[in-house]
Amino acid sequence: MSVPRRMAQAFSLRDEDGMTTVGMVVSLLLALSMIFSSAQVYRIQSVSSRVQSVADAGALAAGNVVAEFMVAVRVCDSVALSLSLTSLTSTGLGIVACCVPGGQGVGAKLLEAGARVADARDSFSKTASEGLTRVQKALPFLAAASAASVAQGNGSNGSDYTALALLVPDSAEDIRVPQEDARAKQAREDAIGQAEEVKELARRAEEAALRAQDAKQRAFDHDCGARPGWCMAERAETLAHMTAAQNPVFSSVDAWSFSVALRRAQAYYPARLAVERPDDGSVQAQAQSALRKRFYTYAAKEVARGYVREGDSFEALFPHLPANTAQMRETELFAQAVYPVSVTGASPTLHAWDGCPKAAGSTSRASLRDMEAGAWETCSECGFTAASLGKVAAASTSIGNGFEHHYEQVALAAEEYQKALEEGAPAKREAKSRVTKLLDQLRDACSSVGAFRIDADPPGGKGVVCLAVNTGPDAPDKGFESAFVQASGQLGCRVAISAATLVADPSGEGRSVIASLADGLASDSALAGVLGAAAGVWSGALSAYADGQSALDAAVREGVGGLPLVSASGLGDWAADALSDAFRTVGLQPANLDALRPATVNTAHVAQAGDSAFCARLLEVKRQAVEHPLMSNDVFSSVVGAVRRDVLQRFDAWGDSMEVATISIGGAQVPVTVALPPAVKGFASDAIGAAADKLLSVYASVTGSRQWD
């Protein structure tokens, strides 16, 4: 039958003029259906994928438990190392203090503190080993509880999440805290055993040094310290008109030395000889001036023989000048044949100098010895005898206004100074020898403590695997109802698996944890007395754990700075320098204090790092899932059983934290704890088993069968 052309055009969906109204409506309906279908698919996928976020959160929560445990391990390591360093450093400071008589009481306390800190280190090592092992064994439960708690906390709007975490590796060997090296114990015992001998040697050296110090002070006063009163410097300026360059003045005995006095005397006599003049024109005045010149010439020659040698030892020669006639007779002044001789009658006459009126026409010369050996006449003009020359020295030696008086006191003091140093040298030398050996022992012991550290490879050290499931009923079109897409039933169970591993976080948090340790002891009144001396050292030793050798050097310097090192013998300063030098060569390396933070990774990476049956099963399941996607649900039947066996443990009670160990020093105690996840308070081991059962039930509801392990 033929259709009229007009009617055919009315029912056409396409013509040369475009689409009809019916065609447009159909196209719009198809487009809207596709849009809403795509949106529905996206929503279903989005809702389903939330379980992966929960699995990730559970893995991170479980990883945080392991990270917290590693903080405790590092704290225990820092305590063990710092207590060893504190013990050895305190012992070294005690040895230094024993070298100073005024600090020997402090030295005894420091030596005792060193021994008691070592005992505390031994006690801490035992409790830390037990405590860390106990917490390590609880890590699987703690991690599982934390993951399960996070999963439950995310349940809302119809979602019902369950998660179970497994640590890789799932177990670890007990943690051992190494005991100190035998060298450290031997070094402390030797220091304590030889302390009394070092004290006695230091006392003898100090007594000798004090005598030497007193002699030097007296010499300084007689040389220039008494200025503007009478002294060598004042007399040299007044009598010989010496310049400041020839006649220096020192304000402190510490800056002065015996060589200053000797050089002053060596410059004085030539200068004094150059300015010597008779008091008047009388024969007696001229004779006395001539004899003074004779004495000054002799004195200049004698003093020029003097020397002062200072360095490791002291040696000096201050030639003594005659102070009276008897002493003059023992010098070359008495034997010098330099005086003119005149003969009047049968007896010769000796004259003081060539200018004597009675010496005119003399043809020979003789000495005072010659005069006293024969029956010689005394000159009626100059009256020259041996006593005349003896009085020249006596006049300036016996009273304080004479240069020779002060020079003689310096010469005597130099002899006393040298004698005292020589008497103290053996004791000082022996003390240095003993202290050097003891400090070398402590240095060697400090060098070895770095090898006795605490290390751990706990469960979860390589990573965490978390299984999560959402069994809550959730309509496919919930919140997105539409007439374009018809939805019925509920979304099925959504499952996911995630993994996390620990990575370093250089944020400085690890350093803060270590630094806060000392605060507990620093404020504890139980540390007063003996152990108070070691508290500051321990703070420095903790810094050495973080910063290495530089902090150890600073701790030693600070400890030395608090000691009473002032001593005449100088043993205290020497021992302090020796201690610093010895510990400077220890070569302590800083520990890695980067905090650990969990980060999500591919589960294969974690599984490959473990060698347990669970890891092998997980890798095999992942391989099969890739090869046979439809069998991927077997991950739960294969894995959950292993998790359940490894995690399920029963604990009687939990608090906010677990105590790993306690630092106990002389009554002061600082606990080292591991914070527990909040979930542990109300999350018993039964909940872990229930979570595993629920996961297996999910698998049964999907596959129609239940596998029992």
Which residue ranges define each predicted feature?
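Mature, structured domains enriched in cysteine- and short glycine motifs
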Residues: F334-G390
